[in-house]
Amino acid sequence: LLIFLAISTLYLFIDKFYFQESPYQGDGTPNNSILWEHFFNNGMQNSIVIGDFLIFHEFDEALGRVRRIQDYKINTEDEFESYIQTNPKRNITEFPLGELPHNSLFNIVDLHKVFLAYKHKFRISFSSEIDIDYIKGRNVIYVGEFKNLRAFSDLIATLPFHYQTLPDWEGLISFTQDDSLITLRAHHDWRVSRYVEDLGIIAKLPGQNNENYLLIIGFGYNSQIKLIDMLCDKVSLQELETQIMTVNNGNMPDYFFSVFKVLGFDRASTTAKMEFFQKVDANFFQNYTQSPY
């Protein structure tokens, strides 16, 4: 709840002192990029969706009181219902608000600079409160873990990769490249150091009715912080676009999917290496066998 209030306060501050009164020019912020321009020239509302964690209340007989719990293994409605069914005597109820990951504060600060540069506003929503109909008629930027995708898992269902979440913010990503199956693992060993090898994806996808979707997803905080920072800084975004054009016949596509390995110490990663890239066609949803529309 405190984090929710913090982000709400942050957005009100941004709206009042930056959107309405600030002379900010965004010199270090992308303001002439194919990646971002589509979000500001189609006349649709922009929504930033944060992948939040499910919270529930449970009565603890030993303590004699109700506890508020966030369990990393109980994060979807199906997982929650299964937990209730297997523990009928624990008096379990879902809390109406989710817990926001700490990285979301960094992400909002970075993203708002882009919106300031384009002089556009955005709305903040949470993955726990929306369904797939939410993507209709609006642009969406999702930032969160694979674990917190919920309805947005439909958006990446036909992308050319597979992912598996593992305990402790680890996971696997597999894709085919040059006729070979490649599997990468997000890993950290905090018994040795705070060094993290995280994995994440950036997917910019077209909607069926001129919407635009940008999904920045990782297994841990590191990938989300680093990839958002990379997209919101003019120099690093230009470097990424140059790298993409190098592997895409000199062109920067409107839509694409990419996998990144992110390296560095906990919440302070310094390196993002693109491991896989593929252009996404403008008729992406025509290939979707169970269309969300």
Model-predicted regions and their roles:
Residues 2-15:
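Hydrophobic membrane-insertion alpha-helices, especially the h-region
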